[in-house]
């Protein structure tokens, strides 16, 4: 895909690159940093849940503002600047309540950026929304570079390098957002239905439930996977490479998803994704001592995150059109990464503390099985859906 006058490919890709590089540090290694501060599993689960919980309200609030002002790019810029300065306060104190305060304040603004940027990207792409994956793949590459690099740095220096690296990356995010052009707004010449009437559609409600359950199932993974591997003898560099492997599989999928979606349809691929995700959690639960099986489980990240995310972004974009686009993407972030992620992280903290790692991942698999049933029952094929089947 080449850059054109209407699609600023490299500037959009650059934001994804650096934004997800920050996640390549935050997601795998922040729990290790919290563990180094002598927080227990319940406290770590709570602190990670705070980051997720702000996604319940923040994206939708900022999405509402963006939809009513048309200033989505300005919101992304302000949110990025405030995120940088608030996160810098993490160096003031290592107390639980201070870290909790900083995480809540920082993530309220940080979580405002991505949903608005997703909507901007879709607007830039126009009718070529299936090319989204060609831009989003740069985010995966940024994640890989960060997770491998920081895993290596931790072994050389110490886990204390994590917050320093994050602050540097947040600064680079600020630079990237000031290189971005404003997106083209889709003008609506006819009256639209209310956003509530869109949400009340059975297929949309089912999709929301499935998104919640899928991200809930990731609670143990995002919160404790690095600690889990470390407790079973894996080195920091190995942990970094395993995270990178999962995202590399995601990258390969993103390169072909624009061909796969039209060919197989959203419903079939969604069911396949959920089945593979349940398998992934069971493999991690029972075969952590086998590096080859853990290797295989990480390859399934292509399904549990990559494929699911591509399907969800596509469906929310098509159901929430025109003036609802910003809030549509925000709703996806709120119910999945927000509510699902927060409840999953919080639950995993208590589950890990009192029932252990195996039970925690088994519960994750059960949640995905419920999502599979909901999808099979309520998300049906509908012909004429932009020449694709749902």
Which residues does each predicted region cover?
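Helix-loop boundary and gating motifs at the non-cytosolic
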Residues: 2-52, 204-242
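Helix-to-loop junctions at the C-terminal end of transmembrane segments
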Residues: 57-71, 154-155, 252-266, 352
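Hydrophobic core of transmembrane alpha-helices in multi-pass small-molecule transporters
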Residues: 17, 86, 96-114, 212, ...
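Juxtamembrane intracellular "pre-TM" segments in multi-pass secondary transporters
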Residues: 1-6, 179-213
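Cytoplasmic helix-loop-helix junction between adjacent transmembrane helices
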Residues: 104-138
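Interfacial helix-cap and linker-helix signal at transmembrane-aqueous boundaries
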Residues: 34-35, 65-66, 137, 152-157, ...
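Structural signature of the two symmetry-related core transmembrane helices
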Residues: 74-88, 167, 268-283
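Symmetry-related core transmembrane helices of the 12-TM Major Facilitator Superfamily/SLC fold
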Residues: 161-178, 359-378
């Amino acid at each position: 895909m080449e850059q054109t006058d209407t699609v600023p490919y490299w500037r959009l890709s650059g934001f994804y690159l650096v934004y997800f590089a920050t996640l390549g540090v935050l997601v795998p290694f922040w729990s290790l940093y919290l563990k180094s501060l002598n927080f227990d599993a319940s406290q770590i689960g709570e602190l990670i849940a705070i980051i997720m919980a702000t996604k319940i309200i923040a994206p939708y609030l900022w999405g509402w503002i963006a939809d009513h002002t048309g200033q989505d790019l300005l919101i992304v810029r302000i949110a990025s600047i405030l995120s940088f300065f608030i996160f810098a306060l993490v160096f003031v104190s290592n107390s639980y309540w201070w870290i909790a305060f900083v995480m809540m304040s920082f993530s309220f603004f940080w979580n405002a950026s991505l949903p608005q940027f997703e909507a901007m990207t879709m607007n830039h792409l126009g009718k070529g929304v299936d090319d989204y994956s060609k831009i989003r793949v740069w985010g995966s590459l940024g994640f890989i570079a960060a997770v491998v690099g920081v895993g290596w740095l931790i072994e050389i220096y110490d886990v204390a390098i994590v917050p320093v690296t994050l602050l540097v990356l947040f600064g680079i995010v600020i630079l990237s957002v000031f290189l971005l052009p404003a997106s083209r707004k889709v003008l609506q010449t006819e009256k639209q239905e209310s956003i509530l009437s869109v949400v009340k559609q059975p297929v949309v409600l089912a999709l929301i439930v499935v998104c919640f359950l899928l991200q809930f199932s990731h609670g143990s993974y995002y919160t404790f996977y690095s600690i889990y591997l470390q407790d079973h003898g894996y080195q920091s560099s190995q942990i970094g490479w395993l995270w990178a492997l999962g995202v590399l599989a995601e990258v390969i999928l993103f390169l072909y998803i624009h061909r796969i979606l039209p060919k197989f349809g959203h419903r079939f691929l969604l069911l396949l994704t959920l089945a593979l995700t349940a398998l992934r959690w069971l493999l991690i639960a029972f075969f952590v001592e086998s590096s080859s099986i853990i290797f295989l489980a990480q390859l399934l990240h292509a399904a549990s995150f990559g494929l699911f995310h591509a399907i969800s972004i596509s469906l929310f974009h098509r159901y929430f059109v025109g003036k609802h686009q910003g809030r549509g993407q925000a709703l996806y972030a709120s119910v999945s990464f927000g509510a699902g992620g927060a409840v999953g992280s919080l639950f995993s903290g208590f589950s890990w503390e009192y029932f252990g790692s195996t039970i925690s991942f088994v519960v994750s698999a059960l949640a995905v099985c419920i999502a599979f049933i909901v999808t099979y029952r309520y998300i049906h094929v509908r012909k004429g859906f932009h020449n694709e089947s749902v």
